[in-house]
Amino acid sequence: MSTATLSKEQREELLKALKERFEKNRKRHEGLEWTDLHARLVRKSRALWSLSEMERTGGEPDVIGKDRGTGQYVFCDCSAESPQGRRNVCYDRAGQEKREKEGLRLAGNVLDMAAAMGIEPLTEEQYRELQKLGSFDTKTQSWLKSPAEITKLGGAIFGDRRFGRVFVYHNTAPCFYRGRGFRGSLTIQE
């Protein structure tokens, strides 16, 4: 993960956007207070940088919960569609290299992009939980963190919402589409 930091202006702009989104979407985090979250965020420069990367790439990150046991806040990309700045990617580096050898141009791969941003791709379980908070990916698709038993065979999974239902599918890891990106999560430690 990059050790990049934000300027004071960038931090203030990001915190303002996060607060506005927090206030506008209270159903995503009932019982949580912005003042508590803000106090934690201002002490976490790496987390702020990761959130700024989520924001910069179109993810519209918002807090979706707080672990009662650990006190950790969980942020997730809450953009209506898969983040625009993270589409046209295959699942992993091997898939990316295969496609590039074929002369195809793509934006990168999920695993490397997520690591560079300091976030984790959503798991299938997290994706289904997110979909309980609204209708996401009704026109796009999002790669999901894929189980080892699938990736070792060259596959990966992705999800979307169609016909009022959430679907999870499989594809080969080298596949990439203009309308398929990935959503990430970030846990803010105590």
Feature names for model-found ranges:
Residues 2-120, 124-190:
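A binding-site-centric feature that preferentially detects glycan-recognition modules on secreted/surface proteins
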